[in-house]
Amino acid sequence: MSAPAEVFSLLKQCADGNVLLSLSSPEGAAYTTTVWALDPARGLLCLSADGGDIKLQRLLESEEVVAVGYLDSVKLQFDLHDLVLVHSGRASALNARFPRELYRFQRRGSYRVRPLLNTSPTATLRHPALPDMQLSLRVLDVSIGGVALFLPDDVPPIEPGVQIAQVQVDLDGDTRLQSGLIVHHVTLLHHESRGARLGCEMLNLGGDGERALQRYIDQTQKRRRLLSL
């Protein structure tokens, strides 16, 4: 949406509800913040910040920063332009140009597909708490913008809220995706499975990646229907 009144209304809801916003860059920098103040007359969006946080310094070095947050069942996403850290006395804040566009995505009702039995999709990443540990996790299911991964119980746990900057998801021979992930849910599976389900959102997938993921979902659905005949 690009109507100024609608953009302002949604951002005000974020401010009033103290909604967490996940900021991320293509280089893998990430930072969590909230909307502090809105000043559309001056064209400014003000976000809370800890000026001494190293993660924030990495984010400010990037020319491309995306903000993602959730209002109930709706995912909000918008670009942050001219992002700068400002100081006033002992307080710090992030100022950016007021967004001209804001994207809304419905979270609930998104169709998830399980990979076919004769395929073995994986996600390759480094453990967020142990960067020297490279993992290859089995993909349990995928949807547009989301993926569920199997974390074996002999691997150190990964907590909800963790962001993983660089992940390669190989769904089949024709579909390889590069993205970041944020872990939203961790669910222990039944004892025989010996592991947990990580419910993740894909970050910075890009237009080509989203189209490739949609093709994979469509093809998997078609093949599953053919196998059931």
Curated annotation (Swiss-Prot):
Protein name: Flagellar brake protein YcgR
All residue ranges annotated as the PilZ domain in the record: 134-218
Record HAMAP family: YcgR
Pfam families reported for this sequence: PilZ (PF07238), PilZN (PF07317)
Domain of life: Bacteria
Family to which this protein belongs: Belongs to the YcgR family.
Source organism: Methylibium petroleiphilum (strain ATCC BAA-1232 / LMG 22953 / PM1)
Disulfide cross-links: none
Protein localization: Bacterial flagellum basal body
Quaternary structure and interacting proteins, as annotated: Monomer. Interacts with the flagellar basal bodies.
BP GO terms, sorted: bacterial-type flagellum-dependent cell motility; regulation of bacterial-type flagellum-dependent cell motility by regulation of motor speed
Family matches, as InterPro entries: PilZ_domain (IPR009875), Split_barrel_FMN-bd (IPR012349), T3SS_YcgR (IPR023787), T3SS_YcgR_PilZN (IPR009926)
CC annotations in GO: bacterial-type flagellum basal body
Cited function: Acts as a flagellar brake, regulating swimming and swarming in a bis-(3'-5') cyclic diguanylic acid (c-di-GMP)-dependent manner. Binds 1 c-di-GMP dimer per subunit. Increasing levels of c-di-GMP lead to decreased motility.
Keywords attached to this entry: Bacterial flagellum, c-di-GMP, Nucleotide-binding
Recorded GO MF terms: cyclic-di-GMP binding
